[in-house]
């Protein structure tokens, strides 16, 4: 793992390959290993970067006073792309939808293309039953640690309010242990996660920020899982309709974490998109234009 400093703190990231950059994101209580099954199946000729965002499975607590609410996390992603001096980025969203708001914030200059797997969007923050349960746990004393310990019990994490609605296939225990270790052992990591979960989620403002994607002019693949119950199927179609150069495809049978349920299908669709649409040849290709 490499790391780089941004104003909020130190961010770890994994990097492999060379060529136009592809940045693969993740959701709460997950890290870069979410993409382990897909990464070897993606086409060569690209530089794949997998940052570990401060969403609960990170290894370095952020700086005291860092803004880790949703707006702060959006800035952090933009700051990370700046710190890495990336141009013509293909940004891949999964589960956490915060980085969709780079356009609304005027911080998408480095983003040329996007791939949007089932993610929070419009007013669906926190998403579905699992998201609302984690938000509730973050407001209770000791709630985050209790939730993390429960996730380590295989039959409990298959319940709908845990991972039962996130992945169709059982999530391996070794992944769960890795993802929950930081919040179980580090008060600083718990503080960071709680700071995000206790932030304000204004559904009207979130919907407006999502709709700002109409100003994104790069190529987009919305790769939705219509069988999931957490990110509405209608949101996938709505996202694709928003952006002038967006296409829509589906991964049947998968839930939110389609890269775990159907890694070969996800890699195939992503690979087709990466190799059939040109990466940006100059900075700002995907930038919001008035």
Please report, for each region that a protein language model flagged, where it lies by residue.
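Alpha/beta-hydrolase fold catalytic core
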Residues: 1-22, 43-47, 82, 86-87, ...
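Conserved HGGG/HGGXW glycine-rich cap/lid loop of the alpha/beta-hydrolase fold
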Residues: 14-60
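Active-site loop/oxyanion-hole signature of alpha/beta-hydrolase fold enzymes
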Residues: 16, 49-96, 268
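Conserved hydrolase catalytic core segment
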Residues: 87-129
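Conserved alpha/beta-hydrolase catalytic His-Asp/Glu region
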Residues: 125-128, 151-215
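Short beta-strand/loop motif that positions the catalytic acidic residue
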Residues: 216, 222-224
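Acidic catalytic loop of the alpha/beta-hydrolase fold
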Residues: 227-231
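Catalytic histidine-centered segment of alpha/beta-hydrolase-like enzymes
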Residues: 254-263, 267
